[in-house]
């Protein structure tokens, strides 16, 4: 009978980071939370869509909170403790995503709003008539 041999697999070690940056991009339709280390390499990310919300529910504050908690739990498992928060956009999930990051157990160093403001750039979308 032939002997079966096991192939040795090389496991990739998870790097541990103590501090990082939380990028929260909040649009009118979705909220995307990306957690990176200080050099900008992505450690974890989550969005309202990847957290199981579809359609109009993606733009709710609860969906943003769920996405932020999901990304935070994955980053906490790498040993991250202190974060800076960069918020971009004017969607409804901005504040709740920040509260969810704070509630997950991170020490927040700073919160910055990096929303870009056009100097009369592109024409805005037309007004809705409902």
UniProtKB/Swiss-Prot annotation:
InterPro entries: Ribosomal_uS11, Ribosomal_uS11_bac-type, Ribosomal_uS11_CS, Ribosomal_uS11_sf
Keywords linked to the UniProt accession: Chloroplast, Plastid, Ribonucleoprotein, Ribosomal protein, RNA-binding, rRNA-binding
Gene name of this polypeptide: rps11
Family: Belongs to the universal ribosomal protein uS11 family.
Locations listed in the record: Plastid, Chloroplast
UniProt-recorded name of the protein: Small ribosomal subunit protein uS11c
One Gene Ontology cellular component: ribonucleoprotein complex
Organism: Phaeodactylum tricornutum (strain CCAP 1055/1)
Keyword Ribonucleoprotein: yes
Coiled coil spans: none
Pfam families the UniProt entry points to: Ribosomal_S11
Domain of life: Eukaryota
Assembly, per entry: Part of the 30S ribosomal subunit.
One GO term (biological process): translation
GO MF, one example: structural constituent of ribosome
